[in-house]
């Protein structure tokens, strides 16, 4: 979906009490005789007079139970009805975008889905939505992923999904949640049908840019430039390298002074640090050349 950085490849049961159970729980209806009415009034005053063999307080409790059961049952029925209605709306939404042949939302349907959500398929919000839906593949939502995803964010329509975006973006800022999103992104970028175990370098670069939308590390631009120039000739990014880069951004300072090759970093990081330090030295030399030229010119003018 939004993460389509390259061309994409292609019941609830009702609850309720039985009528017989409801009827059996109802108290016997008292007659309106003068004697019972008098006992009721007296019982209210003394608190000890029995009505049908029961203390007044107990009788009141008994009388209230059928109402409580009825209200509780009604609430359950309303809850079940609301759940069924929500599932129906999710079903209608899914059918609006699903493929004609496959029971899933594919590339074309995903584009229409994003259009209706007013989001660009390549933006961070779409990646976050795919994360909450636990989508296994780019540009595809299976029926199960779509239904479980909608239920997980309490949404059953375009408007309700849109209303969840601010909260989802805030959730993705939490350290533990972002770590989960970050690791999900690697798996999401793989072509599961081809059994890929590493990300193509170009795909990895695009996904790194995307996943760090809200909290960009200071070293990210240099890292991506290194991968773009690709001096080491790598073709893919392994899961270990992907996961360790997040640790790298958290513990290694932007000046790289606390990086040590003796620690258990992927060898690609060693190459990157060496490349970056050489690049910085080269830039320093380049910056000094104009300064020297200006200095000589000033001396000539003084002479």
Curated annotation (Swiss-Prot):
Gene3D superfamilies: Cullin, PONY binding domain (1.10.238.200), EF-hand (1.10.238.10). The keyword Transit peptide does not apply. Keywords: Cell membrane, Cytoplasm, Lipoprotein, Membrane, Myristate, Nucleus. Residues 1-40 are annotated as: Disordered. It holds the Pfam family Cullin_binding. A lipid is attached at residue 2 (N-myristoyl glycine). It is found in: Cell membrane; Cytoplasm; Nucleus; Cytoplasm, Perinuclear region. Residues 85-277 form the DCUN1 domain. Its main location: membrane. PROSITE patterns: DCUN1. One of its GO terms (molecular function) is cullin family protein binding. InterPro entries: DCN-prot (IPR014764), DCN1-like_PONY (IPR042460), PONY_dom (IPR005176). GO terms for biological process: negative regulation of protein neddylation; positive regulation of protein neddylation; protein neddylation; regulation of cell cycle process; regulation of protein neddylation. GO terms for cellular component: cytoplasm; nucleus; perinuclear region of cytoplasm; plasma membrane; ubiquitin ligase complex. May interact (via the DCUN1 domain) with unneddylated cullins. The DCUN1 domain, also known as PONY domain, mediates the interaction with different cullins. Contributes to the neddylation of all cullins by transferring NEDD8 from N-terminally acetylated NEDD8-conjugating E2s enzyme to different cullin C-terminal domain-RBX complexes. At the cell membrane, can promote and as well inhibit cullins neddylation. This is DCN1-like protein 3.
